[in-house]
A protein has these predicted regions:
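Structural signal for the C-terminal ends of transmembrane alpha-helices
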Residues: 14, 85-93, 165-167, 210-215
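Interfacial segments of alpha-helical transmembrane regions
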Residues: 26-31, 86-114
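Membrane-embedded catalytic cores of phosphoryl/pyrophosphoryl-handling enzymes
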Residues: 130-222
Length: 222
């Protein structure tokens, strides 16, 4: 059982790699335009940071602290363990696979985000180095591991997978709203630039969708 799940993790990792390369090759012009638009948002980063710095109050502190908690791995690991172990104990493959999808999305998006963080070494906004300051090829300290956001990656990976559990619009809106709250909170707490959270959200949403789709295909084949 665990061997099969680990094999699925490996296959999903390959699927993400080839899907990305294939998508870029088939849509070179669109991919280039998206990259240009994304890079242009870097010029907006200081404006967004300044705006968030002016809205601090007790209400927003409370709201964005919820997002701060949601972006930590506690909920992800708790959900994974409860569903995965519960599925095994009650011989329910659907529940077990649901837990494993949460774990997969967390691991795969985490690897991608960590690699990019270490390559780029972007300084966090609170360090006051500016939005175009990078310290390439680094493993730390945390002050220059800003792009992409790890917390936002965790939040969107979890939300994408969990939102796929049920085909219900309200259910999906709730979970993605929580992820967006995490993203906004990271800017509010001056931990990340807007471009940091955008890239993390895109990466984890794509990873989560690949995990969901591959799981659905595997279920149909079995």
């Amino acid at each position: 059982m665990l061997k099969k799940d680990l094999l699925n993790l490996y296959e999903d990792a390959k699927s993400i790699h080839f899907s990305f390369i294939g998508l870029v090759k088939r849509n070179i012009l669109i991919s280039t335009l998206i990259l240009i638009v994304y890079l242009s948002i870097f010029f907006v980063d200081p404006i967004v940071r300044d705006w968030f710095s002016k809205i601090h109050n007790n209400f927003f502190d409370f709201v964005f602290n919820i997002g701060h908690w949601y972006g930590k791995p506690y909920l992800t690991f708790t959900s994974f363990l409860l569903l995965y172990i519960g599925g095994i104990l009650f011989s329910n493959n659907r529940i077990r696979e649901s837990g494993w999808k949460i774990f997969e999305a967390f691991v795969l998006s985490g690897i991608i985000v960590t690699v990019i963080k270490s390559i780029l070494g972007r300084w966090r906004p609170y360090t006051e180095h500016g939005n175009f300051a990078f310290y390439f090829l680094t493993f730390g300290p945390n002050d220059h591991l800003s792009l992409p956001s790890g917390d936002v990656a965790i939040a969107f990976a979890f939300s994408t997978v969990v939102a796929g559990f049920f085909d219900n619009k309200a259910w999906k809106i709730f979970w993605f709203s929580m992820a967006v709250l995490t993203a906004l909170g990271r800017i509010y707490h001056d931990q990340h630039w807007l471009t940091d959270v955008i890239l993390a959200a895109v990466i984890s949403t794509c990873v989560g969708n690949v995990v969901n789709n591959n799981s659905r295909v595997n279920s149909e084949l079995t």
